Amino acid sequence: MLVVTTENIPGKKYEVLGEVFGVTTQSKNFVRNIGAGLKNIVGGEIKDYTKMLHEARMVAIERMKQEATEKGADAIVMMRFDSGSILQDMQSVVAYGTAVKFIED
């Protein structure tokens, strides 16, 4: 499944099938919270959180692709991410875009 952040795919014509999205919510565990608290004191990147957010994005993309496949799409255009905190220890990530089907010339 081709996924692009642009509106057009050079050399391709397509019909729009509709919006697709994938979402995941991940929680921070106790050990990560302790490590993050220490990093907050001394400064620097909190690698466990960075890894968690990267993994969450990958899960959201895969779920979005699955929804597009179920709609019969060949690609997703205008893909974007959104994320936010839920309560204090949870992070939600959504990947969304427009599912399209290629038109043969």
Curated annotation (Swiss-Prot):
InterPro entries: UPF0145_dom_sf, UPF0145_YbjQ-like. Gene3D superfamilies: Hypothetical protein apc22750. Chain B. It holds the Pfam family YbjQ_1. It comes from the Bacteria. Belongs to the UPF0145 family. This is UPF0145 protein LSL_1614.
